[in-house]
Amino acid sequence: MRHRHGLRKLNRTSSHRLAMLRNMSNSLIEHEVIKTTLPKAKELRKVVEPLITLGKKPSLANRRLAFNRLRDRDSVAKLFDVLGPRFANRPGGYLRILKFGFRVGDNAPMALVELLDRPEVEETENVQEAE
């Protein structure tokens, strides 16, 4: 029986799955939006949301826990210096998963994973280049 079984296997060994979710977490924290398959996106939510909750309480112990899970100093710094204060008043639900059609090669369902409350990117550079 699969009662209370935590994560999807995603057809990978445990070490591959851990490395993949760690890399995807780092990419999401760095770029704030990534495109991936829908099952991976749903698993990524289970990994990243507790990390952002850690980032809301800046202590040395929480930084060490986050580094243990991410293994990237730049991601940990952004997590505690940028994302933690940004989501300080939000009690959870820091990610949005948008269905994004199907992949051309194998028809896998794709999704966009993005952090909420992203700062808007100004289009002034593109407007100046067009003129």
UniProtKB/Swiss-Prot annotation:
Name a biological process GO annotation.
Answer: translation
Q: Which GO terms describe its molecular function?
A: structural constituent of ribosome
State the source organism's domain of life.
Bacteria
SUPFAM superfamilies named among the record's database cross-references: Prokaryotic ribosomal protein L17 (SSF64263)
- What Pfam families would the database entry show? Ribosomal_L17
- List, alphabetically, the GO terms of the cellular component aspect: cytosolic large ribosomal subunit
Q: Keywords in UniProt for this one?
A: Ribonucleoprotein, Ribosomal protein
The record describes its quaternary structure and partners as: Part of the 50S ribosomal subunit. Contacts protein L32.
Q: Which family does it belong to?
A: Belongs to the bacterial ribosomal protein bL17 family.
Annotated protein name in UniProt: Large ribosomal subunit protein bL17
- Native source species: Burkholderia mallei (strain ATCC 23344)
